Design a protein with these regions (language model features):
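Substrate-binding surface in catalytic domains of secreted glycosidases
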Residues: 199, 203, 250, 273-376, ...
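Hydrophobic faces of well-ordered beta-strands that scaffold small-molecule active sites
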Residues: 161-165, 187-191, 222-226, 264-266, ...
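Short acidic catalytic loops
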Residues: 190-195, 256-271
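Single conserved hydrophobic/aromatic residue that forms the stacking wall/gate
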Residues: 2-7, 373-385
Length: 385
C-alpha cells in the first residue's frame, strides 16, 4: 500500500508516500521532512516520525553506515574500559578487531565467556573483550520518557456465556425466539451475519434490527460474526492493502451501529502464514474503531500450535477485548484417525497455551455441543454422523 498507517488507542495516524503531511484521525499536520519514501516496492519511514508513536532511541553512525536502535529499556549490566583496548569478533587475542575502545568508555555486558565478556559498544558493535580490561561493573537503568498508548477497551463485569448462532439467510433471523427458548444462562449471542465478499473489503450482511431488539429484550448482547470463508477472496490481497482493510473495517462498524449491534466477532480462518502480519494489522485498526464506537471486539482462534503462531495471539490480547479459543476439532471429518472432538487434555492445553499470551480476563473457551461417530475399516475411515 502507498499509505503508512499507525494505530493509537483511539486514533489512526496516516501518512501518504513521498509527502510531508500526515493525519491523526481527521486532523492534518505537516513535518519539515518527507515522512515516507518509496523505492520500488520498498518503503522507508523517517525514524524521527516513528519516535512520536513508538518507544525507542536511535543513533546514526558511519564507517560502516548503520543505525543503532534501542527499544528495550530497564536494567542493564554495564562496565567501564580500564585502558585503551579492543573489541574483537571472538574471544581470544588473535581474533580480528571490530572496534578500538578508549579508557572510560561504557560498554553493555551481554554475557560472560570464560576470560572474555560479550559486550556491545555505544556505537552498536557487538563483540568480545577481556574481563581484565573492564572495571566498575554495575547495573544501570536505561529509560526514555514516553507515554505508551492505553489500549483499555471494554471489560464486562460478568462471565461471558456466549453462543454462536448459525444464521444463513435473512429469513433465518426469525428463528431466534425458538433458538433461545430452551436456553438459560446466556448473556451473549453471536449470529453469523457478515461475510467478506471480495478483495476490496466489501461485505454481505443479513443483519436484523428485530433480531437485535429481541436479543436485548432477553438480556443478551449481540456480537455479530464476520467470516472470510468466500473462496474467491484472497486474504493477502484483502489484508495487505490499507484501502481494502479500511473499507472492511468501516463497513463492519457502520453495519454494527446501524443495527444496534453490541460487538463484532472476527472469525477469519486458514490465514496463510505470510498474511499473518497483515491480519494482525487489521485487528489493530479495527480495535481503534470499535473502541471509539463502544463496540466489543472479539477474535476467534485455533487451539495454539506451532503452525498458527502467525495469528499473533499476544498482540490480539492487547488490542481485542476478548480472545476466543475454538477448543474443538481435535478430530474432524477429514481426520486420519477416529477420536474426540475435544478431549480434556486438548482443551486444557488450548487454555493454558493461550494464557501464556493473553490476560485471563480476556480469554473465552468455546466448547462443542456435538459428537462425531466414525467407522474404522482396514483401508479407510468414514464419518457417518
Amino acid at each position: 500500500s502507498d499509505v503508512y498507517k499507525r494505530q493509537l488507542s483511539r486514533d489512526m495516524v496516516k501518512a501518504a508516500a513521498d509527502s510531508k503531511d500526515y493525519s491523526v484521525s481527521d486532523t492534518v499536520n505537516s513535518e519539515d521532512y518527507t515522512i515516507v519514501k518509496t523505492e520500488g516496492d520498498t518503503a522507508y519511514i523517517a525514524l524521527d516520525f516513528l519516535q512520536k508513536y513508538a518507544n525507542f532511541d536511535y543513533e546514526v553512525y558511519k564507517d560502516p553506515a548503520r543505525v543503532v536502535i534501542t527499544s528495550k529499556f530497564g536494567e542493564r549490566q554495564m562496565a567501564k574500559v580500564k585502558d585503551d583496548s579492543q573489541v574483537r569478533i571472538l574471544g581470544g587475542v588473535k581474533s580480528p578487531v571490530l572496534e578500538e575502545v578508549k579508557k572510560g568508555d561504557k560498554l553493555t555486558v551481554l554475557e560472560d565467556v570464560s576470560d572474555w565478556k560479550k559486550v556491545c559498544t555505544k556505537s552498536g558493535i557487538v563483540g568480545y573483550i577481556q574481563k581484565s580490561k573492564l572495571k566498575d561493573a554495575k547495573k544501570e537503568t536505561i529509560s526514555r520518557e514516553f507515554e505508551e498508548p492505553d489500549y483499555t477497551g471494554i471489560k464486562k463485569d460478568y462471565k461471558i456465556n456466549l453462543v454462536w448462532h448459525q444464521v444463513t439467510s435473512e429469513a433465518a433471523n426469525e428463528g431466534i425466539e425458538d433458538a433461545l427458548a430452551a436456553t438459560k444462562g446466556l448473556n451473549t449471542i453471536s449470529p453469523t451475519w457478515f461475510s467478506v465478499t471480495d478483495n476490496s473489503g466489501n461485505i454481505s450482511s443479513i443483519a436484523s434490527t428485530d433480531y437485535v431488539d429481541y436479543a436485548h429484550q432477553c438480556g443478551l448482547e449481540v456480537w455479530a460474526l464476520v467470516d472470510n470463508f468466500d473462496q474467491n477472496v484472497d486474504d493477502m490481497e484483502l489484508l495487505s492493502h490499507t484501502s481494502s482493510r479500511e473499507n472492511l473495517e468501516n463497513q463492519l462498524v457502520n453495519a454494527a451501529l446501524q443495527n444496534g449491534i453490541d460487538g463484532i466477532n472476527v472469525d477469519f480462518e486458514q490465514i496463510p502464514t505470510d498474511v499473518g502480519d497483515h491480519y494482525i494489522q487489521f485487528i489493530r485498526e479495527l480495535s481503534v474503531l470499535c473502541r471509539v464506537n463502544n463496540l466489543v471486539l472479539s477474535v476467534d482462534n485455533y487451539v495454539p500450535k506451532g503452525y498458527n503462531t502467525h495469528y499473533h495471539r499476544e498482540e490480539q490480547g492487547v488490542m481485542a477485548d476478548y480472545v476466543i479459543i475454538m477448543g474443538y476439532d481435535e478430530h474432524f471429518a477429514g481426520s486420519y484417525e477416529a477420536g474426540s472432538v475435544a478431549s480434556y487434555n486438548y482443551v486444557k492445553e488450548g487454555i493454558e497455551e493461550t494464557l501464556r499470551d493473553v490476560p485471563a480476563d480476556k480469554v473465552i473457551n468455546a466448547v462443542p455441543f456435538l459428537s462425531l461417530i466414525h467407522i474404522s475399516e482396514p483401508t479407510r475411515l468414514q464419518l457417518i454422523s
